[in-house]
Amino acid sequence: MSSLPVAAVLPELLSALQHAPQVLLNAPTGAGKSTWLPLQILAEGNIAGRIILLEPRRLAARNVAQRLAELLGEKPGETVGFRMRAETCVGPQTRLEVVTEGILTRMIQRDPELTGVGLVILDEFHERSLQADLALALLLDVQQGLRDDLKLLIMSATLDNDRLQRLLPEAPVVVSEGRAYPVERRFSPLSAHQRFDEAVAVAVAELLRHEQGSMLLFLPGVGEIQRVLEQLTERVAEDVILCPLYGALPLSEQRKAILPAPAGKRKVVLATNIAETSLTIEGIRLVVDSAQERVARFDPRTGLTRLVTQRISQASMMQRAGRAGRLSPGICLHLLGKEQAERAAAQSEPEILHSDLSALLLELLQWGCHDPAALAWLDQPPAVNLAAARRLLEALSALDGERLSAFGRKMAALGNEPRLAAMLAAAQTDDEAVTAAKLAAILEEPPRGGLVDLGAVFSRQQANWQQRSQQLMKRLARRGGQPDAGLMAGLLASAFADRIARRRGQEGRYQLANGMGAMLDADDALGRHEWLIAPLLLQGSASPDARMLLALPVEIGELIAARPELAKSSDTVEWDEAQGTLKAWRRTVIGQLVIKTQPLAKPSEAELHQAMLNGIREKGLGVLNWTPEAEQLRLRLHCAAQWLPEEAWPAVDDASLLASLETWLLPQMNGVHSLRTLKALDLRQALQDWLPWPLRQKLDRELPTHYTVPTGSRLAIRYHAENPPALAVRMQEMFGEATTPVFAEGRVPLVLELLSPAQRPLQITCDLSAFWQGSYREVQKEMKGRYPKHVWPDDPANAAPTRRSKKYS
């Protein structure tokens, strides 16, 4: 084993770990960094405490743990153990734990000091998964504030060293050149005249006919794997075994794919990018690369994820090609042109830039971090995705202002995705808890095969769901209870209320409570139900409507009876412009779905006024009578908040005024019963009465409506939301004014638009003194010739102002 490439840099690495808190290791696939190096660090690294090795994928974690234990002549659970979702194999003597990403985050949250841990190794960091970025940010925070003795080793096959070194400028970089056999890289675009699955199968069969050895075929997703597998069944020889490999396969099936082919056989492993790194698949010397991958991209506008098929990066192509040279010289056939490959992005985009960040935000708030920018990230989480995450957590009642609510803390402690955590935390009885646990297990690993009816799926017994359900029950500290299908709708509604759906028309089309559209296949039996709740949705690329992947029929009356907080009643108003009247209605809604509408026959004045306010909020402030005087007062208040921020000026933007109608408009509405009388309201008076007397006085003093110029003329000042105040005045009327007037306690100069006798602009200035002493001379010279009957003195700052020409002066 010492012949492994990474062995050559072991002394350098061990020295770096002794002298630096963070170390970067760049070692290509097959160098031994996952399956050999951790044992050497354990034996020779003088690490004070356990070692945690993070592997992104469950299959890789299990295999790495198995391999490391075998090298010690042991079984997992002794010196080497592993932890992953729904399965733990560690013992009292375990000193090296291989864990998956979510597990590491939970360990840090439960014990921020990582008591008893001396080193954390982040493997395959180049994949830049969301959880790996979060783990790095948390670990750096732990090192800085709690454990300056904790060591961190970041290792990868294609480290983005420049970015990491900017983040960790003091970290030593250890580079292992690796040992790969030569790989012949071929490039051949697929035929445009064949279906993708058929064209891939033809290319694979052709390569198998001319070359020996087993093959690894990279495809973007499960659908392509299944279709290409069908095509290959008829095209390959009898000695070829076809093995699918993707993350949703049961681990037992995944392990079959990576075992050596039986004697006299060879195999084709049809894999997603799960096989790019970590996994060693025995006997592979041929790789066919579709050069495509399927990526989940979150849409913060809809709150849904869309699966996008895209070209892989050049780094991923290199990784895939490298799989052909692990054991002997090999061949990699890329199914695209060489020029196309050279135009591909150099590196894959990190998950944090295009993912749903609600789970990350929940973790950060549990950590006590209210501003993500306070942590060290390779890429800052996008603000728009964080805003969408915050909206979801608010809808789930997880927040109390900027912090987690008591319910949010209960959610965070469970360690599940936020919606599932909310559903689990909402369970009150043992029966509800076990029902929620089974639902969560199903939604984490949904069945394949196209069955959408969640009720039918729930009735199934599946070992992985049962195992996961039991683990979740332990987290909830619950025992006993029986799964009850009758509780499903209420539990789902506690986390997916925005995905309650009502049928619209035929052919499986529905509207969701969040206003979006959703659909089933036209022949799906669920389509006969008027109401569904669809916890699992996927945003399609061909239609604006989301596709329901799992949905449950609900009786809406029973659901509201079980969860009355879902339904909101509101009084709204309809404007009858022709009659000048208002019609008030009471609507009962779930989100944007109207359950019931009833007229308010004889509403009281208070009810009618509230309905009017709701109508104004619905239609906007434009339905009110904004006179120039009212608009000017609103602008002055806006400017006062900017120029005199130390005072508590009321906010007058649209959103704030709509939110505070009861405070400033309602007191003026006595006797208002119709649209005509509503539009007659004096909004200037309403806003002025809203101001406390001291602020009203200060506004009139510091931001006056008019300014009296030297001639005595009282001229209106123009206020603007983004610019200083302005005054248009004939230049002769400003003679004798030496300096520019200032407002807002001397902080804001008045912009003077100095006009000719014909009221045309001559000069715009906010420094009158400089103008009189400077460019006025040129204006004077020109104006004397054009307006000889008017006064153009040599010393305007001290001259007498006038409204008239020389004849009348």
Role assignments for model-derived ranges:
Residues 181, 518, 714-716:
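Short, isolated positions in well-ordered beta-strands
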Residues 399, 432-517, 530-706, 745-809:
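Acidic, serine/threonine- and proline-rich low-complexity intrinsically disordered segments
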Residues 111-126, 290-294, 303, 315, ...:
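Extended active-site and interfacial segments that coordinate phosphate-rich ligands
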Residues 121-122, 240-241, 250, 254, ...:
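Charge-dense polyanion-binding interfaces
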Residues 686-748:
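C-terminal accessory/binding modules appended to enzymatic or scaffolding proteins
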Residues 1-423, 483, 538, 722:
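P-loop NTPase motor module signature
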Residues 520-521, 585, 717-718:
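Short capping micro-motif at the N-terminus of alpha-helices
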